[in-house]
Amino acid sequence: MAGGRRGPNRTSYCRTPLCEPGSAGGAVHGGIPSVSGVRSRARSSSSTGLSSPPLATQTVVPLRHCKIPDLPADRHLLFELQLFFCHLIALFVHYINIYKTVWWYPPSHPPSHTSLNFHLIDFNVLTLTTIVLARRLIGAIVREASQGGKSSVPHSLLLVATRFAVLTGTGWSLCRSIILLFRTHSFFNLLFLCYPFGMYIPFLQLGWDFRRPGLSHMPNTRDLASMDRGSKDYLHVLQHILRHHMPSAEPLPTHACCLSPDLIRSEVHYLKLDFNWRVREVLLSSMLSAYYVAFVPVWFVKSTQYYDKRWSCELFLQVSLSTSVILTQHLLPARYCDLLHKAAAHLGCWQKVDPALCSNMLQHSWMEECMWPQGVLVKHNKNVYKAVGHYNVAIPSDVSHFRFHFFFSNPLRVLNILTTLEGVLIFYQLYSLLSSEKWHHTISLALILFSNYYAFFKLLRDRIVLGKAYFYTAVPDCERKLN
């Protein structure tokens, strides 16, 4: 024939779906759902970089999750006390920077018998700032004293007295400071104290969605039904602002290790919202603490008082960064990051490919009821995607699923970021300490460094232990026997 030569009859490939809809809908982790065979044409160009699925039957094998050791963690009340102590150190060194004296001068110069000009300090501002910095500690004490349980009558009376004393003392000190500040300062100056809260209200009102899915298998879903879009008001927004700045002692979510695509996507959606909630709590708490440590004291300084503005800005950055690292380490512990990693492993990921490079390869129509093995090509929204994960139930066009898998596919990613940030902060503080020439800068950096060493030690300890645990799990059994 003029058009080409004749050859033997070619085998026709049946383009059947990869899996039957609903085949993995009710499977549990112990079962192995079978998936129909996947065949591709033999003509695969080596220049495309795409490998077609094997000719044998594809089978979804259950994942083997790593069992991480139980790392010691601080109690919630002890952690809040440690965080408050770090904030007090930062506030103390900032007051040294503002109200320092020249007490070492000889009597011929204007001497001072103290290292600080205490008569220039506004103790009402100091009291208000201390209460704001202690808000999480106060909430933790009240929560510990409010926990019910079978206890003796004297113990119950002691808890009630403790709760009453803490709330009464805090409320009286706060009201007294605010009243005295209204007498000595203008209303415009007092608005500076409420500036962070004024920014949160429109930000929360317009930008955040507090709705959460009602998942029955999640034991500790926060009740956010009152924050529906149709019923948002400023009272509810203020309530959730306070929740962001109060300590969160809720238990960690649990991992529903199942092979149902719908349940896996629902679990990932819930964990994504829970993770965003924890990150928002970290950001809001750290920014508010740094604001009251670095900016509020200098705003109420008299016009004749000199202070180092550059040091105040550096202190704001250092306090916000160190507080963010400490809070993130507490709210995102190793067990929680391992939970997110397991969910990301079940979710999988898709990589968008050029349709021209895989036109001669078998392509399936993506179905949400199916669980797709690694290396399969699917069509979704007129695009072609390749399965990247061990098995994949993510929506190919959903960017949030891609980000979730990218960020949590490595279980040590969050811990590596925190360790790097804390290490860079400590290195910068050590460099500033060695190059400082002023006595108050030396004292300030030395005290702040001591408050960061403990957090860095815990991060390094967790990183070393978890790194060895995940590495031991990743090594095949045959290599372990050889070693």
From Swiss-Prot:
Membrane topology according to the record: Multi-pass membrane protein
Q: Which residues are glycosylated?
A: N9
- Keyword list, A-Z: Endoplasmic reticulum, Glycoprotein, Membrane, Transmembrane, Transmembrane helix
Where in or outside the cell it occurs: the entry states: Endoplasmic reticulum membrane
Kindly give the Pfam families that the UniProt entry links to this protein.
Tmp39
InterPro entries found in the cross-reference section:
Uncharacterised_TMEM39
Q: Which domain of life is it from?
A: Eukaryota
Chain segments annotated as transmembrane: 76-96, 114-134, 158-182, 187-207, 281-301, 414-434, 440-460
Any one cellular-component term (Gene Ontology) = endoplasmic reticulum membrane
Task: Return the similarity comment.
Answer: Belongs to the TMEM39 family.
Q: What does the record give as the function of this protein?
A: May protect the cells against DNA damage caused by exposure to the cold-warming stress and facilitates tissue damage repair during the recovery phase.
Name of the featured protein: Transmembrane protein 39B
Gene name per UniProt: tmem39b
